[in-house]
C-alpha cells in the first residue's frame, strides 16, 4: 500500500531534519556529472534550452536540456546517435521547445574524455 512509502518518506525526512542523515550526499555526484557534461556540450556549440526556472538558475541534477543550432529535437536525437550519444526529444516530455533531455545517470565522470571526443567529432562535422 502507499502507506508504507509515506512512512518511509516521513522517516527519511525526520532523520534529515534531525541531522542524522544528509539526503543530498547520495545525489551530489549527479550534480557533478551534469556540470561536467554541460560544460562539454556548450564547449562544442550546444546551447542549454532550460537554464532558468522563473528567474532562478536551474541547479545541476539528474538531467539537463540542450539544442544544437539548426536542428530540431527529433533530428538532433537521430544525429547524435551516430556519435554514440543518446538523449530524448523535449517534445516527448511535453515541452513546446525544440531540444533534447540528456540524462546523466549512465555517464560517470571517468567517461568525460570519451564524451568530449564524441562531441568534438560532432562539432567538426557540423560547424559551418
Language-model-detected regions and their locations in the chain:
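PLP-dependent class I/II
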Residues: 1-128
Amino acid at each position: 500500500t502507499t502507506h508504507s512509502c509515506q512512512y518511509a518518506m516521513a522517516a527519511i525526512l525526520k532523520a534529515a531534519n534531525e541531522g542524522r542523515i544528509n539526503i543530498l550526499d547520495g545525489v551530489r555526484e549527479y550534480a557533478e556529472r551534469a556540470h561536467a557534461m554541460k560544460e562539454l556540450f556548450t564547449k562544442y556549440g550546444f546551447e542549454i534550452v532550460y537554464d532558468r526556472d522563473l528567474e532562478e538558475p536551474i541547479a545541476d541534477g539528474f538531467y539537463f536540456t540542450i539544442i544544437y543550432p539548426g536542428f530540431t529535437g527529433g533530428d538532433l536525437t537521430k544525429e547524435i546517435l551516430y556519435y554514440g550519444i543518446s538523449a530524448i526529444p523535449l517534445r516527448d516530455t511535453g515541452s513546446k521547445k525544440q531540444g533534447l533531455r540528456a540524462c546523466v545517470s549512465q555517464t560517470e565522470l571517468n567517461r568525460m574524455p570519451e564524451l568530449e571526443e564524441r562531441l568534438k567529432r560532432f562539432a567538426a562535422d557540423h560547424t559551418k
